[in-house]
Amino acid sequence: MNGIRKKPATLQLHNIKTSCFIDGSDDQSDRTRSSSGDSTSNSLKLSHHISDELINAIYKELKSPVSPWDKNISQHSPWLLEAASNSIGDSSPLLSPISPLKLRFHKYSVSKQLNSVGKQGFGLSSNHSRYASPSSPARLARGALGEELSNSQYRLECAAIQKLVAQKRANRRSSKSTLKNSANDIEFFDIEEVSSRKGLIDRTPSKRNVTSRVSDAYSRLKSAVKGESSLSFKRNRSKSKRKIQHLGLTEFNGWEHHQCDWL
């Protein structure tokens, strides 16, 4: 039984003829007073007669406060108390009384009741109408969501997210400023050094200056924005296409030398 008292079966008193609780004293008196001609009626009377002790025992059992057959069980069960007659206080050890018919809405209000004891002081009728009303499931969901949004853990998560977003924005701004400064510094590069390295000394001065400036601008700009921007250049684009065409993508049969026009 594990210390748990289960509710026994209800008393079946409708079939009185099969009852074996017969008062013996009344039986003897009836037998002495009855004649032999009244034996049939006497046996019928005995079969319908129940002992007074059995009636008193049943009455006491029904009126006992711990009786499982107690008709007024709402006085002893905290889940069946009337909502209008009580209120939650600091000294109340019980949760608010929730009817068994409303248990499917009880999960929305248990945490709210435990957290709001001694803080708001509203009655059970308003608590029922706000959190345990079967006619407003959307309002229940909104109330639970609002409580979750006001939690301290949620505020901490929001602060962490805002900090991360601010850091990403700062990094993006710094990368943009670096790219802009690199583009402005192209005018001050040493052209002669770059032209000698590229083998442009033999060209005419006019072409050498123009070509070196363009080549130097391209190389410096590419190195400045490497890894920080999604800009693509024609030279890198053609190299990537040639590499991808010969990767040997065996999982796509027949696509080893596909023309990568989509790149």
From Swiss-Prot:
What keywords were assigned to this record? Answer: Mitochondrion
Q: Where in the cell is it found?
A: Mitochondrion
Q: Where is this region: Disordered?
A: 22-44
Protein name per the record: Uncharacterized protein C146.02
Q: Where is it predominantly found?
A: mitochondrion
GO CC annotations on file: mitochondrion
Ranges annotated as biased composition (Low complexity): 34-43
> Does the keyword field hold Mitochondrion?
yes
